[in-house]
From Swiss-Prot:
Binding positions for heme b per the UniProt entry: H87
Domain of life assignment: Eukaryota
Name used for this protein in its record: Hemoglobin subunit alpha
Assigned keywords, A-Z: Acetylation, Heme, Iron, Metal-binding, Oxygen transport, Phosphoprotein, Transport
Family statement: Belongs to the globin family.
Native organism: Talpa europaea
Length: 141
């Protein structure tokens, strides 16, 4: 459960991401594909090379979904229901991949905002991404 402090930390951190959200989403995806090559199996039709338009576009989708989630911290299941259905029933993404991408997103945010990435902010963002991952995998059952 996200505390009031967590919610404040998440909103403040995401405000700093701002216009860079799509760029950071793409960077986190590239980091995921490089660090965990098995994640590439879900994107056989993508050009996965550095800077590819397809990775940038999907990174923006990821970032937009997270921006939506940040705006609905009190109702993540409702805000992410359609994405949960898509990933569970159509795409059939292995749930572990959400954790891998979450880790890579935290690394990306820490690299770009080292002074703002305090232990408290790190913990809040980690809880947020874990909650988002749980919501996205809730329809798998």
């Amino acid at each position: 459960v996200l505390s009031g402090t967590d919610k404040s930390n998440i909103k403040a951190a995401w405000d700093k991401v701002g216009a860079h959200a799509g760029e950071y989403g793409a960077e986190a995806l590239e980091r995921t594909f490089t660090s965990f090559p098995t994640t590439k199996t879900y994107f056989p039709h993508f050009d996965l090379s550095h800077g590819s338009a397809q990775v940038k576009a999907h990174g923006k989708k990821v970032a937009d979904a997270l921006t939506n989630a940040v705006g609905h911290l009190d109702d993540l299941p409702g805000a992410m229901s359609a994405l949960s259905d898509l990933h569970a029933h159509k795409l059939r993404v292995d749930p572990v991949n959400f954790k891998l991408l979450s880790h890579c997103l935290l690394v990306t945010l820490a690299c770009h905002h080292p002074n703002d990435f305090t232990p408290a902010v790190h913990a809040s963002l980690d809880k947020f991404l874990a909650t988002v991952s749980t919501v996205l995998t809730s329809k798998y059952r």
